């Protein structure tokens, strides 16, 4: 039974249904928790949906169960590189190369780790001040007379690392803050604003306050403080792919969702901190949108957004289902046509559909 589930998971992976693959591998692991290959394969599926931390955990478990499983080291190295943990990635890849010396991927990835590590070390080197030109009329100062030259400090790294991934209907932001009390975390949602403040005793408060790539529905957004992270789920106002978490000039901005005035009232939470003028922030966002001229993909995104906002329930269901199942290549408004069957991926004219290499 476990092998059958693993085969189905592999088929889902090849069909780019990575979330389904993770779920099926998890069920296979429940039935056979000592199979290293299941953990290594689930790690690969987790990498595809940007669950890099979970992928490292799976790879470590696979290595523990079967120390000679080369693909487990490859998965760990890949996930650690995505997390920018290049030294850890290199160590895993070197171990994998010793297990499978004929696998060229290890050498290529080790070389990339060396390059990244060298870049990090270069950033830490303090630049020397330029020498002053000599002058025949101005006497040179002695070492005792010369004022000390301040050495610029390396830029401080953020207190906590964060990452972002998305689904058609929501974007998920994960802040890797361990053992932070829930009462020390403040999260607020605006129409296109996210504000996160984490107070840590004895440290400067951590702030994450991006203007988001697209608009959200604040009433449907939520967050959870866990032992190892703060997970924030942003409900997208429209079914569309965000190019990044933060808005950038020239990127598409979605129109305000069509919700009732009752739902658009934002909840107010008691706080000792100064209140934020969300209306002012949103007015600035709207002014920037008004001044922008949309073209190309941005204009197309707005066109589809307008269709969605004015569509009836069946049309919206058809758009959501066709977009999600076709990996964004098909958008149908005919529920009778797509409601009873899976919508296959259809590449644009002149392009070829390719599967992820497993």
From Swiss-Prot:
Domain of life: Eukaryota
Protein name stated in the entry: Protein SGT1 homolog B
Subcellular location: Cytoplasm; Nucleus
Induction note: By infection with the oomycete H.parasitica (downy mildew).
Domain CS: 157-246
Quaternary structure and interacting proteins, as annotated: Interacts with RAR1 and HSP90-2. Interacts (via SGS domain) with HSC70-1 and HSC70-3.
Family to which the UniProt record says this protein belongs: Belongs to the SGT1 family.
GO cellular component, one term: SCF ubiquitin ligase complex
Gene deletion effect: Delay in flowering time. Plants loose R gene resistance mediated by RPP2, RPP4, RPP5 and RPP7, and show reduced response to auxin, jasmonate and coronatine, and enhanced tolerance to heat shock.
Protein species of origin: Arabidopsis thaliana
Domain SGS: 268-358
Spans of repeat TPR: 2-35, 37-69, 70-103
Gene: SGT1B
Region: Disordered, residue numbers: 255-275
Its biological purpose: Involved in plant innate immunity. Essential for race-specific resistance conferred by multiple R genes, including RPP7, recognizing different oomycete pathogen isolates like avirulent Hyaloperonospora arabidopsidis (downy mildew). Contributes additively with RAR1 to RPP5-dependent resistance. Not required for RPM1, RPS2, RPS4 and RPS5-mediated resistance. Functions as a negative regulator of RPS5 accumulation by assisting its degradation. May be involved in heat shock response by associating with HSC70-1 chaperone.
């Amino acid at each position: 039974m476990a092998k059958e589930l693993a085969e189905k998971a592999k088929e889902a992976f090849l069909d780019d249904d990575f979330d389904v693959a993770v779920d099926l591998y998890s069920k296979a692991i429940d039935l056979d928790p000592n199979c290293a290959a299941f953990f290594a394969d689930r790690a690969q599926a987790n990498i595809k949906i940007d669950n890099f931390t979970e992928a490292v955990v799976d790879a470590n478990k696979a290595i523990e169960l079967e120390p000679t499983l080369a693909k487990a080291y490859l998965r760990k190295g890949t996930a650690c590189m995505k997390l920018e943990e290049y030294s850890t990635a290199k160590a895993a890849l070197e171990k994998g190369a010793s297990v499978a010396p004929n696998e060229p991927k290890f050498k290529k990835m080790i070389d990339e780790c060396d390059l990244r590590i060298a870049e990090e070390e270069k950033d830490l080197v303090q630049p020397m001040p330029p020498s002053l030109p000599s002058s025949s009329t101005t006497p040179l100062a002695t070492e005792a007379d010369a004022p000390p030259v301040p050495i610029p400090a390396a830029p401080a790294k953020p207190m906590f690392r964060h990452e972002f991934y998305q689904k058609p209907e929501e974007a998920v932001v994960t802040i890797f803050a361990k053992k932070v009390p829930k009462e020390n975390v403040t999260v607020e949602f605006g129409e296109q604003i996210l504000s996160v403040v984490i107070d840590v005793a004895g440290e400067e408060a951590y702030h994450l306050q991006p203007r988001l790539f697209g608009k959200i529905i604040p009433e449907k957004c939520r967050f959870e403080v866990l032992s190892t992270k703060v997970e924030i789920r942003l409900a997208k106002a429209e079914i569309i792919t965000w190019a990044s978490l933060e808005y950038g000039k020239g990127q598409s901005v979605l129109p305000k969702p069509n919700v009732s005035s009752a739902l658009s009232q934002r909840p107010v939470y008691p706080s000792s901190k100064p209140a934020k003028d969300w209306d002012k922030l949103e007015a600035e966002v709207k002014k920037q949108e008004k001044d922008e001229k949309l073209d190309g993909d941005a204009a197309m995104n707005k066109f589809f957004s307008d269709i969605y906002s004015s569509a009836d329930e069946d049309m919206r269901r058809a758009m959501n289902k066709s977009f999600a199942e076709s990996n964004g290549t098909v958008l149908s408004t005919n529920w009778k046509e797509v409601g009873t069957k899976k919508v296959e991926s259809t590449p644009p004219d002149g392009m070829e559909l390719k599967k992820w290499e497993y």
